[in-house]
Regions:
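HhH-family (HhH-GPD) DNA N-glycosylase catalytic core used in base-excision repair
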Residues: 1-243
Length: 243
């Protein structure tokens, strides 16, 4: 199984993958804060048809301009109306994220410090959700999943885990921007396609695509590569889409 996963990883994880994937958007920026913001925003709308995701992301980042970080801290986002961006994600949702980011950057300086201050990824996700709510008068967003309490069931947090994969793992596809969090601590961004492929390969037994399934699959993949289990996200994607 490891040999098969490695072969697919080498096949899929190449620079040619970048223009076909939402990861292309954070690759367009150089400033740390821009890359962080764009990673979380692009991952947040990464559901549905890939071509529509890319089109919607182009629309969203046209709104945020050359520096999404400047767009946030200048308060420029307050001029947004409430036009649709992607499926159930509207300009009001983008404003929510901008207010949350503004709070997080004022408190932590960068988002890496926010996540690195937690004991593990799940607690980091929970803290991110809490801090984003604090920037929005205590209101939670349906677009930021609830990881639940430690060791208990909760959302798979696919889109947050995807953003974290981009920011933590080294290239050529992922960004490797964050150095204080190790790839070994990441969890698989579990979508329906990856889950289906994992079950076919007997790597995942749990029927629900939730937090417990993410932990189960990541632990199975960790047996093949303890230092970087989430690399096989590319393998499972490739097997599911291309084979």
């Amino acid at each position: 199984m490891k040999e098969k996963l490695e072969l697919w990883y080498v096949k899929i994880c190449t620079p040619d993958f970048i223009p076909l994937d939402p990861v292309q958007f954070p690759h367009r920026y150089k400033k740390r804060q821009d890359v962080e913001i764009v990673s979380f925003l692009a991952a947040t709308i990464a559901w549905g048809r890939r071509d529509l995701i890319l089109r919607s992301a182009e629309k969203m980042f046209a709104l945020t301009g050359k520096s999404p970080y400047d767009f946030v801290v200048s308060g420029e986002y307050k001029k947004l109306k409430n036009k649709n961006i992607h499926r159930t994600f509207f300009e009001n949702d983008l404003k929510y994220f901008c207010r949350g980011f503004e709070h997080c950057y004022a408190k932590y300086g960068n988002l890496e410090k926010l996540f690195a201050s937690s004991e593990d990824i799940w607690r980091g996700i929970a803290l991110f959700r809490e801090e984003m709510a604090k920037g929005n008068k205590g209101i939670y967003s349906k677009h930021i999943s609830n990881a639940g309490e430690a060791d208990k069931s909760g959302s798979a947090c696919k889109r947050l885990n995807l953003a974290l994969r981009w920011l933590v793992r080294p290239g050529p596809v992922d960004l490797g921007l964050w150095k204080s969090i190790k790839p070994s601590s990441l969890f698989i961004p579990l979508d329906v396609h990856v889950a289906r492929t994992a079950r076919k390969l007997k790597l995942l037994e749990r029927k629900s695509n939730d937090k417990k399934a993410v932990i189960e699959l990541t632990e199975r993949l960790r047996a093949f590569c303890p230092e970087d289990p989430v690399k096989y996200d590319f393998s499972l994607f490739g097997m599911g889409v291309m084979s």
